[in-house]
Regions:
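Bergerat-fold ATP-binding/catalytic subdomain of histidine kinases
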Residues: 84-99
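Acidic ATP/Mg2+-coordinating residue in the GHKL
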Residues: 72
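A short glycine-centered beta->alpha linker in the GHKL/HATPase_c
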Residues: 76-78
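Short beta-strand element(s) in the Bergerat
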Residues: 64-68
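GHKL-type ATPase core
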Residues: 95-166
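Generic recognition of well-structured, leucine-rich alpha-helical segments
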Residues: 24, 43, 89-92, 113-116
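Bergerat-fold GHKL ATPase/HATPase_c domain
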Residues: 1-49, 53-60, 80-83
C-alpha cells in the first residue's frame, strides 16, 4: 500500500473547496433563496424583502444578477451569532425536525447564490449592527481561513431606506 502523506493531510482541500460549495446542495437558485427566506421566518420575521440587482455586462446583451439582498424584520442576531451563522455545522436546533438542524443552510445556500456573502444583523436598534462575511475567492487562495468576529458597522446606505429605524 502506498502512503500518500505520512504526516497526514487536511480534511478539506481548501483551494477547491470554494467551488465545490458553490456547486453542491441545491438544485436551483430558487431553492437556495428559499432557505434564506426560511431563516427569516424562523427568526419571527413578519416581512422579508428580497432585492435582486442585475446589469448587462460590457461583453454581453443579457442582464446578469450581481447582488442579492435579503432584508427582514426578525429578531436579529447577537454579534456571536452573526459570526457563527456563517460557520458550517453550527446548527442551533439539533433536537428539532426540519430546517436549521445541522447548520449548513445559510452558508451553503448563500454561497450557491453568490461568491461573497455578507451578513448584517442587529438587536436593540440599527446603531448596534454587526457584520461578518465569507468570500469564496479568499477561501480558495488561503486569505480567509476562519470567520473573523463580527464587526460593529453600519447598514449599507442603499439598504437603510428599507429598514424600520424607530
Amino acid at each position: 500500500m502506498k502512503v500518500v502523506n505520512a504526516g497526514g493531510m487536511d480534511i478539506i482541500n481548501i483551494s477547491d473547496y470554494g467551488e465545490a460549495l458553490r456547486n453542491s446542495g441545491y438544485k436551483d437558485i430558487e431553492s437556495a433563496m428559499a432557505e434564506i427566506v426560511d431563516n427569516s421566518i424562523q427568526a419571527e420575521a413578519d416581512n422579508v424583502l428580497v432585492i435582486i440587482k442585475d446589469r448587462v455586462p460590457s461583453w454581453g446583451r443579457r442582464s446578469q444578477v450581481y447582488e442579492v439582498a435579503f432584508l427582514d424584520d426578525g429578531t436579529g442576531m447577537s454579534p456571536e451569532w452573526v459570526q457563527g451563522c456563517l460557520r458550517f455545522g453550527n446548527g442551533t436546533r439539533r433536537t428539532s425536525k426540519g430546517m436549521g438542524k445541522f447548520g449548513v443552510g445559510l452558508p451553503q445556500s448563500s454561497l450557491y447564490a453568490c461568491p461573497r456573502v455578507e451578513v448584517y444583523s442587529w438587536q436593540d436598534g440599527v446603531e448596534n449592527t454587526y457584520s461578518a462575511f465569507l468570500d469564496i475567492e479568499k477561501i480558495s487562495n488561503g486569505e480567509q481561513v476562519k470567520i473573523e468576529p463580527a464587526e460593529k458597522t453600519a447598514i449599507p446606505d442603499e439598504y437603510l431606506k428599507y429598514v424600520k429605524t424607530g
